[in-house]
Amino acid sequence: MKKLLLKCTTAVLCILIVVSFSACGTNETGEENSDSETISVSSNDGEQDTGKRVYFAAPLFSQSEKDYNLKLTKVHEDYGYEVFLPQRDGYLAPELEGKTEEELTQMIFEKDVSEVLNADIIFVVLDGRVPDEGACVELGIAYANNKRCYGIKTDARSVELNLDLNPMISGCFTKVFKDYDGDKLIEALEQYLSENEL
């Protein structure tokens, strides 16, 4: 019961964040507020639009997570996708020196939102007892902006009531690749990419 409550709470929080984000800068009538702060989103001016820009959303807090993220990113790049991997392509340590926690949080948030909006596709690692909260927010932003959404899952811990994922999360995806053997999942992803475009 606690697991189900935690899953529901996580889903509600993700939905609230997405709804709050989509309402930023508007008042109750839907008009833009002149006094609200906005996030500057740069377009890829001058870059050729291939439809193959991927934002890779995943937990990146342990070495094993980072290593697996790099393996999956390499598979995408081997098939011609341009991947933004936050652990690799985000801010460099010197850019973050001397910043307050609030400044760091805002910088990372704005960078990641901008990259999600500039992507054509979001690819989300759904492993963990519950999917990573940041990845769920990024998924919500991508889904709300009509991005193509794909996920992978190798972790069996959250299987409950024959629902592997919360329906509010799984409903966002075009396809979720599942295999509890990470190497077999990579093989399945390679097979899919050799026959299909994301």
PLM regions and their residue ranges:
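Conserved catalytic or regulatory cores that recognize and/or transform ribose-phosphate-containing ligands
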Residues: 25-198
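Hydrophobic helical h-region of N-terminal Sec-dependent signal peptides
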Residues: 10-18
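Bacterial N-terminal signal peptides that target proteins for export
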Residues: 1-11
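C-terminal motif of bacterial Sec signal peptides marking the signal peptidase cleavage site
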Residues: 20-23
